[in-house]
Amino acid sequence: MAADILGDYETFVKCKASAHISAGFEPGDLPNHLFDFQTEIVKWACLRGRAAIFADTGLGKTLMQLSWADEVASKTGGTVLVLAPLAVSEQTIEQGRTFGIEVSRVAQGGTPTGPGVWITNYERMDAIDFTELHGLVLDESSILKAHDGKTRQRIIDAAQGVPYR
């Protein structure tokens, strides 16, 4: 009896295990201004296609996410959207400018109007047509921590069809 239960449990656990299916691509030449560890993280994220970069304060998350977004936009010829808190949007645009990555702000109530890297804040995401996106970056993804949060569920639902995220 105990062996049957253990066997059933092992089967159950094996069914729950998920294997990573690569959805990414080999990145091109990444910017020289990335440190070696940042380059490796961006390469890893590009190869996965769907990845999360959880790096400590001061390790260059913004530069890494913008480098990834720029690679996706270049690879697909499409639109990549960065969703960020309003307070960090301008800082992200400035950092992109500093490192040669153009980041355009989505007009209020609008949607990205062409290929490239775009940014808007979480409060404006309802105006975005996510079916037009080729990539999505969630800056300050702590917004996803509230497992019962409405914003979290809206993002999950909207991002289902975005190939790179």
Give the positions of each predicted feature.
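SF2 helicase/translocase NTPase motor core
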Residues: 3-55, 59-164
